[in-house]
Amino acid sequence: MIYDTTLPYPRDLIGYGQNPPHAQWPGGARIAVQFVLNYEEGAENAVLHGDAGSEQFLSEMFNPASYPERHMSMEGIYEYGARAGVWRILREFEKRKLPLTVFGVSNALQRHPDLTRAFVELGHEIACHGLKWIHYQHIPEAVERAHMQEAMDILQRMTGQRALGWYTGRDSPNTRRLVADFGGFEYDSDYYGDDLPFWMKVRKTDGSEVPQLIVPYTLDCNDMRFALPQGYSHADPFYQYLKDTFDALYAEGDPAGDNAPKMMSIGMHCRLLGRPGRITALQRFLDHIAQRDKVWVARRIDIARHWAQRFPAPKF
């Protein structure tokens, strides 16, 4: 199956359909579990960063206004993630020797070099989450392209490695094409519509067509819902939702049942899940999956490479 964005109707509502491929996860795993830690603190909308107004998204405030000057409370909420929350989350993974993928905004990482070094030393993957954590929907294409190049350059300088995964999040209709234009990305995660990776046919700006591996992300198994009206008010419902999702997918991967292993993504934010009253949801979930066998906890790059090896890029 290939998602063909070059067709007159560029959406694919069919996907793998009734017969998804067997993922063949390493060790015969029934599920691949993938944790993403979004590191955005210090790159959010702020007049200090040259933006028109203060941040409005994913904080402790309900429907905050965007001010054309510094918003001290909003800055403090974001600073909590960088000063305290991120370390609380990292400790949970370090004590369990589990890997994760960091969606790192380059300006944020640049403002916290000690943390960037810690990510690398702990063996976590850093995927590029753009230059600034802003909405690119109406940003001129040339500006978005320049931001992407600068973001990659910063990560290269700070880590000594080129980012192999891309996720903008607040993307634009141009983002996927620009990712293909740059090339060299083993996966793109700006997609939420499947439980398995898949190949997408993308037309580059020069008119050529290339396959791009998509490793889907999630907005439901995501602590961002602590900051949404219809979301979680405390740790218990978030833990229960993660547990229910895992249990359902684990059952689908049972060789004696559906025998259809999938992947489960979990999205985390330092300023949200890193709070003491919320971290217990993560702790309980990690304890829950540790009680099951045939569970592969992996970085996104590991999943991408596994998929590309088992299901090579199509030729066209």
Each predicted region: which residue ranges?
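Binuclear metal-dependent hydrolase catalytic cores centered on His/Asp/Glu-rich metal-binding motifs
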Residues: 221-241
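A structural motif
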Residues: 206-226
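Catalytic alpha-helical scaffold of carbohydrate-active enzymes acting on polysaccharides/glycoconjugates
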Residues: 2-213, 239-266, 272-316
